[in-house]
């Protein structure tokens, strides 16, 4: 091979490497993290690991609590380990989200009654993780949900028997 051919091969390889490295960089990826039961207590409360998003950390924490209670009522929650039983939804009615939408809107309103049935499980500094993006904050934490209290409320409201 001549010197001219070697230069052409090196130039072609350099252009190929540069072209391959000029891909679109993904800045944010969507992850669908499902809530999971971390532990259960004898008083009917469940510690649930969940995610919430908001404009600031306080709003994200409130959304995290709403999400945990919502999942318990309407969707059920999977267990994080094999020695804890998964939790079925409290409302087993078909189309429960649509049927009880008015009740749910009042219950989950800002400052709503849902706050009486959940609390931050671990109050130590650093127990919740916050991830900041350009426009929002995403929070991951563990929330204690009073499932026994929620069942009693739903029975009292006539939603479940």
Model region roles, listed by residue range:
Residues 10-19:
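Bacterial N-terminal signal peptides
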Residues 22-161:
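Domain-level marker for long, solvent-exposed, non-transmembrane regions
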Residues 1-11:
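Bacterial N-terminal signal peptides that target proteins for export
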């Amino acid at each position: 091979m001549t010197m001219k051919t070697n230069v052409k091969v090196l130039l072609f390889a350099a252009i190929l490497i540069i072209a391959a490295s000029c891909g679109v960089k993904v800045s944010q990826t969507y992850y669908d993290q499902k809530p999971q039961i971390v532990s259960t207590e004898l008083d009917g409360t469940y510690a649930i690991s969940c995610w919430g998003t908001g404009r600031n950390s306080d709003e994200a924490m409130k959304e995290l609590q709403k999400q945990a209670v919502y999942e318990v009522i309407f969707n059920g929650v999977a267990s994080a380990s094999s020695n804890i039983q998964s939790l079925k939804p409290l409302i087993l009615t078909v189309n429960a989200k649509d049927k009880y939408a008015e009740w749910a809107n009042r219950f989950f309103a800002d400052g709503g009654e849902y706050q009486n049935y959940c609390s931050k499980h671990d109050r130590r500094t650093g127990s919740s993780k916050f991830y900041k993006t350009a426009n929002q904050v995403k929070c991951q934490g563990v929330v204690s949900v009073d499932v026994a209290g929620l069942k009693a409320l739903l029975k009292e409201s006539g939603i479940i028997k």
